[in-house]
């Protein structure tokens, strides 16, 4: 599983929690259950491969991090979505932005540009294509407010980095 797929899986978990209200740890453990997980591969290709141990740690971290800071993350979204009430933004798009903001603020190993690019990709995939511009505008404004450089990252660089991560993860699991 690539880091991008792990991020997409995190969005699924965060979004699912919007409806169940379950504790973050339970959401992750239930979805990754050895009996249940294989059934999900028929629903979405991101479930074709099981996440590595490092990716499970990532999922635990971001799902609980977003859950524990949801109000603050929504306040940030509200502040930068000028002219929009945060409750008018689809839950899924809001979850995508919550994850990206959490990564920007708390995940030092995730470059700001990657967090934003991935959020735009996921928003376009799961919402309307024009949602990508909306998400990009909000997250870009937020990043600029932090004086965080939003580096230009090409799709090729992202894919190359994900392939390297996948190779490193496999090598680490073999040790």
Regions inferred by a protein language model and the residue ranges of each:
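N-terminal interaction/assembly modules
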Residues: 1-125, 129-132, 136-175
